[in-house]
């Protein structure tokens, strides 16, 4: 491990600063209790940066991220900045440029339904079953139809308007995301399901062929393929059959949100975006939730689990990441809840949940 591991913390807007305060409790425990050599610096991002520095992604923030080993991100955006041009708003002008600047091509979205929270899932109880489910959706983030050229809108001579986008994938883009999926499968349950539409799309034919070739390097991992339409049905029908879902940009955008909603609370779900050097941006899967900003009722678990993902994938310290995850599970088993996951009015405030998880991590109970 490095003698110093530098983390740029970007709290952002809405509930971002509130849940980030709870993540700091975990970071301080990692420094002081587990003796991890963390160097933590905080920078402005999003609407907060617009208000204070005039732009959503200040040069100082970008430079700080360049000089770090990982980014811990909160959330950005809110109605306050909706009057700005779209490309100047916090969401478009901060997070997307960060992803592009650091070439964060792989998005990891765990979707876990804890057995203690199965009542939250919209799925029938016999589908969610007593042990819940744990899926990791791996989405290619920098290729595909969102970035393909040409794209645009036009008008034909007979006044018929039309629009077009281009789905394009290069084999190296598929190759690197596939290798990552198989490598992560070797740390989990040795199963990868690749999702495509190769019965219709040429880009999906290349996707399936490339993933199949890469799989030969990982004979211990079982590979299966599903068309996107069937995959979305199978996830609802029996999520337990899946471990890792490997998806293109468009399909991953759809599938990762589907996996998230069947857990019942997006406030529980972290995410990571990685580049080829395993530099990563770690953030909750949810948004800035301005409607509950300042009420001290936001769920900090997704932000805390984002720290766990940073430790697992950025620092490669699986055992310590497991301890953070286990602390969350232990707290849930004891019946502690925040407002979004409580089935009654007896719930903890944001800071109280952070304290309980932090104390559990220290005690190991």
From Swiss-Prot:
Could you tell me which SUPFAM superfamilies the record lists for this protein?
Isocitrate/Isopropylmalate dehydrogenase-like
Q: Where is this site: Important for catalysis?
A: 146, 197
Q: Which reaction does it catalyse?
A: (2R,3S)-3-isopropylmalate + NAD(+) = 4-methyl-2-oxopentanoate + CO2 + NADH
User: Cofactor binding mode, per the note?
Assistant: Binds 1 Mg(2+) or Mn(2+) ion per subunit.
Record carries keyword DNA damage? no
User: Where is NAD(+) annotated to bind?
Assistant: 78-91, 287-299
Pathways per UniProt: Amino-acid biosynthesis; L-leucine biosynthesis; L-leucine from 3-methyl-2-oxobutanoate: step 3/4
Q: Where in the cell is it found?
A: Cytoplasm
Single GO biological process annotation from the record: L-leucine biosynthetic process
Q: Which cofactor does it need?
A: Mg(2+); Mn(2+)
Q: Name one GO molecular function term.
A: magnesium ion binding
Q: What are the record keywords, sorted? A: Amino-acid biosynthesis, Branched-chain amino acid biosynthesis, Cytoplasm, Leucine biosynthesis, Magnesium, Manganese, Metal-binding, NAD, Oxidoreductase, Plasmid
Assembly notes: Homodimer.
Its job: Catalyzes the oxidation of 3-carboxy-2-hydroxy-4-methylpentanoate (3-isopropylmalate) to 3-carboxy-4-methyl-2-oxopentanoate. The product decarboxylates to 4-methyl-2 oxopentanoate.
Q: Which PANTHER family match?
A: 3-ISOPROPYLMALATE DEHYDROGENASE (PTHR42979:SF1)
Tell me what this protein is called: 3-isopropylmalate dehydrogenase
Q: Where does this protein come from, organism-wise? A: Buchnera aphidicola subsp. Uroleucon ambrosiae
């Amino acid at each position: 491990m490095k003698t110093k591991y530098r983390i740029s913390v970007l709290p952002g807007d809405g509930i971002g600063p509130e849940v980030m305060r709870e993540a700091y409790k975990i970071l301080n425990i990692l420094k002081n209790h587990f003796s991890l050599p963390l160097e933590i610096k905080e920078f402005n991002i999003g609407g907060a940066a617009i208000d204070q520095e005039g732009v959503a992604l200040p040069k100082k923030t970008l430079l700080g991220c360049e000089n770090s080993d990982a980014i811990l991100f909160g959330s950005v955006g809110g109605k306050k900045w909706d009057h700005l041009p779209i490309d100047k708003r916090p969401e478009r002008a901060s997070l997307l440029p960060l992803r592009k600047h650091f070439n964060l091509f792989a998005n990891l979205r765990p979707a876990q339904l804890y057995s203690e929270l199965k009542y939250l899932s919209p799925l029938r109880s016999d589908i969610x079953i007593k042990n819940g489910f744990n899926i990791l959706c791996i989405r290619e983030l920098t290729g595909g139809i969102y970035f393909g050229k040409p794209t645009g809108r036009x008008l034909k001579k007979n006044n018929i308007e039309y629009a077009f986008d281009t789905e394009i994938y290069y084999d190296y883009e598929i190759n690197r995301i596939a290798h990552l999926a198989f490598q992560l499968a070797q740390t989990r349950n040795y199963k990868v399901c690749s999702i495509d539409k190769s019965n219709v799309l040429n880009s999906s034919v290349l996707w399936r062929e490339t993933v199949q070739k890469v799989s030969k390097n990982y004979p211990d991992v079982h590979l299966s393929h599903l068309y996107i339409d069937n995959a979305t049905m199978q996830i609802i029908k029996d999520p337990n059959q899946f471990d890792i879902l490997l998806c293109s940009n468009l399909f991953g955008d759809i599938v990762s949100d589907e996996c998230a909603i069947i857990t019942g609370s997006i406030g529980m779900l972290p995410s990571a975006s990685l580049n080829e050097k395993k530099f990563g941006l770690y953030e909750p899967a949810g948004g800035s939730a301005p409607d509950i900003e300042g009420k001290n009722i936001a769920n900090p678990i997704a932000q805390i689990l984002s720290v766990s993902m940073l430790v697992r994938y950025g620092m490669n310290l699986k055992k310590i990441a497991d301890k953070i995850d286990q602390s969350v599970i232990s707290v849930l088993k004891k019946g502690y809840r925040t407002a979004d996951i409580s089935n009654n009015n007896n719930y903890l405030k944001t800071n109280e949940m952070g304290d309980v998880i932090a104390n559990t991590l220290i005690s190991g109970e």
